[in-house]
Amino acid sequence: PADNFLTEEGVSLGRMLFYEPLLSRDGTQSCASCHRQATGFSDPNQFSTGIDGDQGERNAMALINIAWSDELNWDGSSINLEDQAFEPITNPVEMHDTWLNVSNKLNAHSEYPDLFKAAFNIDQIDSNYVVKAIAQFERTLISGNSKWDKWYRGEVSLTEQELRGWDLFNVDRTDFSAGADCFHCHTAPHFTDFTFHNNGLD
């Protein structure tokens, strides 16, 4: 966005903050605690567990290619990554802190004041710049070089089995016996149509 261009300093700072447990009340929970890198920056569990061992109502969404999403959270309640990053800090089930306390901890830190100065030319760290840095990092979480991406660009070939899977994925809903009809909702190249669907599951 126009008010938060990506910079090398901002992305690097955002990555540090994403893995920083100081953002939680007791210093045990970071963004990465639920958005796990090994699982596409998502939580493989049905419900994510927060700072006090409490379970949330949903699990942490995948962040890969999140830069292309205009509505965030499972209910679309956030309009951009900056807006979304405000929420977990003060959520009593997630990180259960206050922005005043988090800002004070970061301002008193041995490294963060200089890093925020380099990224945003500010002398006092506050919530607005914390979420801007995290959002910058999240916009760099891009998967664009998988085998499917390379095939889509005409750079490699898929195996016969993979091509059969692609055909099944793209069979139209009028003939369920012939395939899976995935593509209507999981639309290439991001494998989402960026809308919300009721699939009948709680």
Sequence positions of predicted segments:
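Short glycine/threonine-rich turn/loop motifs
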Residues: P1-E87, D149-D202
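Amphipathic alpha-helical substructures
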Residues: Y112-R173
